[in-house]
Design a protein with these regions (language model features):
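Non-catalytic accessory regions of SAM-dependent methyltransferases
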Residues: 1-42, 46
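Conserved Class I SAM-dependent methyltransferase catalytic core
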Residues: 211-271
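Residue-level signal for inorganic ion chemistry
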Residues: 29, 64, 94, 123, ...
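Conserved AdoMet
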Residues: 28-103
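Mobile active-site "lid"/loop adjacent to the S-adenosyl-L-methionine
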Residues: 186-215
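Short helix-capping segments at alpha-helix termini
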Residues: 19-20, 132-133, 154-159, 226-227, ...
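Conserved hydrophobic residues forming the short capping helix/wall of the S-adenosyl-L-methionine
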Residues: 16, 105, 153, 223, ...
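Conserved SAM/SAH cofactor-binding pocket of Class I
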Residues: 92-194
């Protein structure tokens, strides 16, 4: 008798027990193998026969490949993004930046949005989806990231309002923006990371010198000229970096405030233009 979806998920959960999200991982992989949404699967597919394609997916996850890379997408804010090797996987923690912007701008929203280090397009495209009248620019040093972000913009119907191109932080940008979003690399070069991050996600998007602050040093002197009067900059930080980043920004004449994520950890520096 063929193994049921329910039983296969249970067995995979045990196999993936080294992951903090083993059950969720197994459910997402099974839904992908079935070609349905996870919620649909949980409501009506659990007693069906498990598909043969499930086992190879579990084996990939057991080798620490991120679920988002295996299934090819990740939800962020109100949108779903295609992701793959060479681009950082969006994290729920980064939604803190969008929450700060929504609190500040309300329904009216910003007119122009800048995303420095656009990656998959998560921050820029979430902002454009939130405010239908906004337009934006996203830049990244990675050609792979630019390619993936452009694909996401096209798939979400946002390409007409989003310009996405190669760029190194603010170099070559000579206009000001109402909303500036940035999730720069901020991990110390010697830091030990979980295998699914260390083995698969791009180091270019993770590491920022011996103290993790190199890219904040690059950003600090550029923010004032990029942020429009009355605008808002939301810049992600590591959980223990607020004092150091605030000091860097203060040295550049910027007055920042700390924004915490839903877990109560320092997650972003907020600067008003």
């Amino acid at each position: 008798m063929a193994e049921s979806v329910r039983a296969a998920i249970g067995r995979a959960t045990a196999l993936l027990s080294g992951s903090d999200s083993a059950r969720l991982d197994a459910e997402l992989l099974m839904a992908h193998a079935l070609g349905v949404e996870r919620g649909v699967m949980l409501l009506g597919w659990l007693d069906m026969a498990a598909p043969e394609g499930f086992e190879p997916l579990v084996a990939r996850r057991a080798a620490h490949e991120p679920v988002a890379y295996i299934i090819g997408h990740r939800d962020f804010w109100t949108i779903s993004l295609d992701v793959g090797p060479g681009v950082l996987i969006p994290r729920p923690d980064s939604e803190t930046l969008i929450e700060a912007a929504v609190d500040y701008f309300g329904k009216a929203g910003p007119a122009r949005v800048l995303d420095l280090g656009v990656g998959s397009g998560a921050l820029l495209l979430a902002a454009l989806a939130e405010w239908p009248n906004a337009t934006g620019l996203g830049v990244d040093r990675s050609a792979t990231a630019v390619h993936i972000a452009l694909g996401n913009a096209a798939r979400l119907g946002l390409l007409g309002r989003a310009t996405i191109r190669l760029g190194d932080w603010g170099d070559g940008i000579d206009e000001r923006f109402d909303l500036l979003l940035c999730n720069p690399p901020y991990i110390e070069g010697h830091a030990a990371l979980a295998p699914d991050v260390a083995l698969y996600e791009p180091g270019l998007a993770l590491f920022a010198g011996p103290d993790g602050l190199d890219d904040y040093r690059r950003l600090a002197p550029e923010l004032a000229r990029l942020l429009a009067p009355g605008g808002l900059a939301a810049i992600e930080i590591g959980a223990d970096q607020a004092p150091a980043v605030l000091a860097l920004f203060a040295a550049a004449g910027l007055d920042g405030a700390v924004r915490r994520d839903l877990a109560g950890r320092d997650r972003a520096i907020i600067i008003r233009g």
